[in-house]
Amino acid sequence: MVKVWWLKLMIKIKINGKDLEVKPKTSIIEVADQVGIDIPRFCYHKKLSVAANCRMCLVEVKNFAKPLPACATQVMEGMEIFTKSKFTKDTQKSVMEFLLINHPLDCPICDQGGECDLQDTAVAYGASKTRYTEEKRVVFDKNIGPLISTDLTRCIQCTRCVRFLKEVGGMAELGLVGRGEHAEISAYVDKSVESELSGNIIDLCPVGALTSKPFRYSARSWELVRRNTVSCHDSLGSNIEVHVKDNIIKRVIPKENESINECWISDRDRFSYQGLYHKDRINNPLKKVKNQWKEIDWEEAYELIKNKINTINTKKPNQLGILCSPQTTIEEGFLLKKISKQLNTTHIDHRLLEKSFSKNNNWLGCKIEEIESHDSILVVGSNLKNDQPLLAHRFRRFAMKNNSFSIITSYDDFNSTPCLGKIIGNPSTYLNYLLEILKEVQSVTKYKINSESIKNALKQIKVSKETKKISESLTRDKSKNAIFIGHQVLAQIEGDNIKIIAMHIAKAIGATFGVIPGYANSVGLSELNLSLDEVNTDEVINQKKESFIMINFDPYFDYHSPKKITKALKSAKFNIAISPFVSDSLKEFDIVLPMTPPTETSGTYMNMEKRLQSFAAVTPPHGKSRPGWKILRVLANFLELEDFSYDSSDEIKVEAIEEINKNYSHNIKDFENSKKNKIPQGLELISPIRAIDSDMIVRRASALHQNENIDQAFAYINPKTMLKENLIDDQKIKVSSEEAEITIKIKSDEKVSLNSILIFGKQLSTASLGMNHKLKIKRSS
């Protein structure tokens, strides 16, 4: 009996004589994949729209005179499909012959050789020789950037790359121009492809037309050893497959995990491996001797550290400050916490870029795959495309399906995302906007607020049209809404207040509340309760310490105030860096211990949805560098601390998970009506961090930094603000903050909020400004 799809009932069909019951509106190719019947395809991909232009999936269907494309034909009651009949095989052989007419016979030099869909399909479904003897066409290759190499003569016009960049990347950066044999893939006006997800078109291309430029001609596919691991560059925790030859990483591709990264990865995850082999990488422990680095052995390094720390601890207690990267694994974080307790120091933290230090609700609040199941979403203060490129794709997909996505941000980088409500304002205005939403929501839901300080703040608030529109979308008769706050909020002086108000809004409407964490193990270290006694990074830096231990970060780039951290390091008597790299930023350190990056160690990360993901080393340690957990374990043994006899990271993980499961309770701060820190008047600095500058490894990945002018810093200002300040495009100005003064060129950008200057953070020429200040400007002479 035929049952209609909206009642979720099934229809009966036959494939190759086999009776099946399937859901209506399912394509033939989807049904075949579900039951393990192979149908060849080039243009079809389960995550992209149907194009049906390669015709390779043509199959015979009973009562149809012509073969039908399996990707574009939906099953019907009683349909009989034949994928192995002579008619189907002859059709597929003809299509294969047609596709190979202009394809060059250059498989021996093609990077796709050995893993090419065209090769495999030609062998399985094609003829043994061609009848075509005419000249083949040649298509000139195009330069579409430093990441993707083009050999467009090989292209079979499947348009997977075109559809991916438009539908997933959000920008139509490639297109199919021309008709018939003149058709070819082209970038618009010969521009490069700049999507943060562009590298996925390399994997999507079924032939060798698009290949990895950094990987080009470096190895054959059968020479590579494939090892699975987890990305360390954002809090999504993308699953990746690393390809290794001679213990050197040659390329990185996605490992499918539908609930996290689906079958995609960001360009940052794909190409950052180049940074692992940068000239700054160190092989041996280094000791500062007359302002020069001298290589020493591990035992000498440990003895030196032991003597210095014991001397400092004997004279003054609690004089050791410990700061680590939020990329630190759970095992390393657990050992750091254990060391700090036994050394009687409470000054330890990992929140290097944050000024909001409340510990409650520091994760996404839901599973990643549940984002699209919400009815309405509000995101506050997140530069999604740079911070979390694949999460941005999920939000965009939600917005395309539901006209109920709203954003409050300081930079309008959401042109490809349909927004019901969009407020572009300075980070310092986020609190007022959320108070407006809370006031409107309270009037609708009659939500009771007990805090007197919030009540007093709401009395002074007037609700604008923009916030009323967002409030209405959140208070409609819906059962599942969500509010997410991003890194821009956590980096604000008012961050805790913003978080409190956002949580009240979520509570008033029964919505999910979540934080979009910045780094691979931000959530894990918070759950581990790494920062003891509510001490935070700023307090560690501002209190004069005799000694600092800093793990896996660059103090000049990765802390929000380079001036303050440099001053703290200068005043200390002995500083220890545990890092894979050495640079001028470490000039205030006395000793550097070479630590392996995540690809050369084992460990565990907890991603934004609180999912634990363990990984093993994919290559051996570089030189005499050692995994972080081993460095800390041996250091603890030299310091004669108790209970550090671990033989593997797995042993540490067991104890660390027990620590996480203790469920530490944290005091939720009350809303504070007055700002603690008064900042001078001026244009507000917006300092988002580009995906290619986020950490030490990515900053050293050469291919990611090869686009023209990509490392040239500019100050981006709204044209209206430029008019008000009497500034013009390409003018050089002097910009000064509380930290430093720099000279920089202006670019006008309508996406930037009014009365602000956008200067990307963590760049060499601009990092000295620090982050989140008011700026004073004057014309450069």
Model-assigned labels for residue ranges:
Residues S410-Y411, T417-N450, G495, H504, ...:
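Short alpha-helices
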Residues Y44, K337, S373-D375, V379, ...:
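A cross-kingdom feature strongest in bacterial/archaeal respiratory oxidoreductases
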Residues L210-R216, I249-R251, I322, H347-D349, ...:
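Acidic/polar loop patches that form or flank catalytic/metal-binding clefts of enzymes
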Residues D246-C263, R268-Y277, I282-K287, D297, ...:
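Long hydrophobic segments that form regular secondary structure
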Residues S479-Q543:
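A glycine-rich, hydrophobic/aromatic-adjacent loop/helix-cap motif
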